[in-house]
């Protein structure tokens, strides 16, 4: 977590929990372009988003793209099971996701994860300060700055131009 004495400057100032409850310092992603997304396994957007996320990850992981997926049960109770059930049954088996899936978080409200408070404060604007639904996406540059925010209905494939620009891929 970011220290209480200083305001976080980038996502690298945060530590989150992985799916097994271990601390992960996000500074390990320095130099990577990131898509940070809140996910759910029982949402109408699940199939298209996980399929697209997996495709875009396979296409650009070797150029420095990482996807950080955070399960969330705040929207229609669409991520109800344990994190282990969700990951094993849905993400890894069905969608063959190779990118990291983290511990379940709240993205809105008093108990929102500090990372999500930072993401929302960095890119609120048109979207306001709250996450509207599952599969809201944040694009982060190689320095850990939040560059853009995409709605749940924006497909990962339609983010490709922005991703390529940050990766420096022609």
UniProtKB/Swiss-Prot annotation:
GO terms for molecular function: peroxidase activity; phospholipid-hydroperoxide glutathione peroxidase activity. Keywords: Cytoplasm, Oxidoreductase, Peroxidase. It holds the Pfam family GSHPx. It is found in: Cytoplasm. The active site is at 43. Its main location: cytoplasm. InterPro entries: Glutathione_peroxidase, GPX_AS, GPX_CS, Thioredoxin-like_sf, Thioredoxin_domain. Its EC number is 1.11.1.12. GO terms for biological process: response to oxidative stress. It comes from the Eukaryota. One of its GO terms (cellular component) is cytosol. It catalyses: a hydroperoxy polyunsaturated fatty acid + 2 glutathione = a hydroxy polyunsaturated fatty acid + glutathione disulfide + H2O. Belongs to the glutathione peroxidase family. Protects cells and enzymes from oxidative damage, by catalyzing the reduction of hydrogen peroxide, lipid peroxides and organic hydroperoxide, by glutathione. This is Probable phospholipid hydroperoxide glutathione peroxidase.
